[in-house]
Regions:
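Active-site core of metal-dependent hydrolases
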Residues: 158, 162-286
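Alpha-helical scaffold segments that flank or form the walls of functional sites
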Residues: 46-48, 55, 65-124, 148-163, ...
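Active-site gating loops and adjacent loop-to-helix segments of metal-dependent hydrolytic enzymes
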Residues: 78-89, 137-165, 208-220, 231-245, ...
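Histidine-rich, glycine-flanked metal-binding segment
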Residues: 1-49
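Metal-dependent enolase-superfamily TIM-barrel catalytic cores that perform enediolate-based chemistry
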Residues: 104-132, 139-203
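Divalent metal-dependent hydrolysis catalytic cores, especially in the metallo-beta-lactamase
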Residues: 58, 74-106, 123-137, 164-176, ...
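Divalent metal-coordination and catalytic microenvironments
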Residues: 6, 26, 45, 56, ...
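His/Asp/Glu-enriched, well-ordered alpha-helical/loop segment
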Residues: 233-246, 264-276, 282-363, 367-370
Length: 385
């Protein structure tokens, strides 16, 4: 199958090009000049970009990762392609070991089925799991249930890792509670990303965590001590150390656009990662109330979700294609930085850049075609439309 457009994102620029896709292998077989062969699909001036990857998303359409329900997870994977997502990490919230173990086993089961037969679980590919908690600061817990926020426990984590079939790719933790940085070092040694978040760490403590193998920061600005010119905290460390990745929620509610612009100016085109941090409310009517981590949460008209009892911001319902639009149109971020933030950089973060994240021969045919308003015209997940 041959696709073509006059605006294909290749080698960090827009080019007129054809993409040859194998529907059998799900790979990009080659990229050629526009019009060089008869195209099966000609998208004219529509933008063609790599498939989006969301490495921090709790759920959507009424489902939450912690629910441990197969059908909910399948429905989620099938529907998030509507926003251009071709790969994602179902993300847990802090809870009891029993609840988390069931959730991890559920994701692992569905992911195994999808890997064995991609038609059995159509839609976006489950690329792993993001374990957000339980190793978080009680002070900066946000909407996470406080009673389950505990210090890092290496033996417990090993049980979680086994339950996940080795699918845990990212662990968010409060590094100030990681005695001797044992958990951080263990994660790094085993190819798992230690990401600082929901933490009261100082800039110096964050720097030591990076020196011990931490590689990322979870939703920069949120769930941590704020940046101050005398104590810049985790945000300051994320800005200073260029090789560290940083997530950011680009909905205009979690962070002001000037703060988003500052973040990407500091991180450049290679280390900023856009995430949705979406809750089960995505795709549901305004005013819906549901439990999140045992707490009652309500969906507001602006797309944000808040704890009913305290009004605390609990998460978002951001769609990744809308986040891309926000980066370009509202935050004023350059195209290369904006596109990389939802494609190549998340792939690099989780060590999948050899097969994901860019339009290149030999990589998976994860392709999104965007209209002028950034809505999705069509999508290919591993070559399947």
């Amino acid at each position: 199958m041959i696709l073509q457009s006059k605006r294909v994102w290749i080698l960090n620029q827009w080019m007129e090009a054809q993409i040859e896709v194998s529907t059998e292998s799900g790979k990009i077989e080659g990229i050629c000049s526009y019009g060089s062969r008869q195209a099966d699909m000609d998208f004219g001036e529509l933008r063609v970009v790599p498939g989006f990857i969301d490495v921090h998303t709790h759920g959507a359409y009424g489902f939450d990762t912690n629910d441990a329900e197969e059908e909910g997870l399948r429905n989620w994977a099938q529907n998030i392609v509507s926003e251009g997502v071709t790969g994602f990490l179902p993300t847990t919230i802090t809870q009891s070991e029993e609840v988390l173990t069931k959730a991890l086993k559920n994701v692992a089961k569905v992911a195994r089925e999808q890997k064995a037969d991609r038609d059995s679980v159509p839609g976006a590919e489950i690329l792993g799991i993001h374990l957000e908690g339980t190793y978080l600061s009680q002070k900066y817990k946000g909407a996470q249930p406080e009673e389950f926020c505990v210090k890092p426990d290496l033996e417990q984590f090993k049980r979680y890792f086994d339950a996940s079939d080795g699918l845990i790719r990212i662990v968010t933790l409060a590094c100030e509670n990681d005695e001797g940085y044992q958990m951080t070092r263990f994660l790094n040694e085993n190819g798992i990303v230690a990401s600082l978040g929901h933490s009261s760490a100082t800039c110096a403590q964050a720097a030591m965590a990076f020196a011990n193998g931490a590689r990322s920061v979870t939703h920069v600005y949120n769930g941590m001590a704020p940046f101050h010119h005398r104590e810049p905290g985790i945000p300051g460390a994320a800005f200073r150390f260029k090789d560290v990745f940083g997530e950011i929620i680009c909905d205009g509610l979690h962070s002001d656009w000037s703060a988003v612009y500052t973040f990407f100016t500091c991180k450049g085109p290679d280390h900023g990662v856009m995430v949705s941090d979406a809750l089960r409310f995505k795709g549901l009517p305004v005013g819906t109330r549901m439990l999140f981590g045992g707490n009652l949460v309500e969906l507001y008209e602006d797309g944000s979700a808040h704890l009913v009892d305290s009004g605390t911001l609990a998460g978002s319902t951001l769609k990744i294609n809308e986040g891309l639009r926000n980066l370009v149109e509202k935050a004023g971020v350059p195209w290369q930085t904006a596109i990389n933030a939802c494609t190549l950089n998340p792939a690099r973060l989780i060590g999948m850049e050899r097969t994901k994240g860019s339009l290149q021969a030999g990589k998976d045919a994860d392709i999104v075609v965007l209209r002028e308003d950034y809505s999705v015209e069509t999508i290919f997940c591993r070559g399947r439309n």
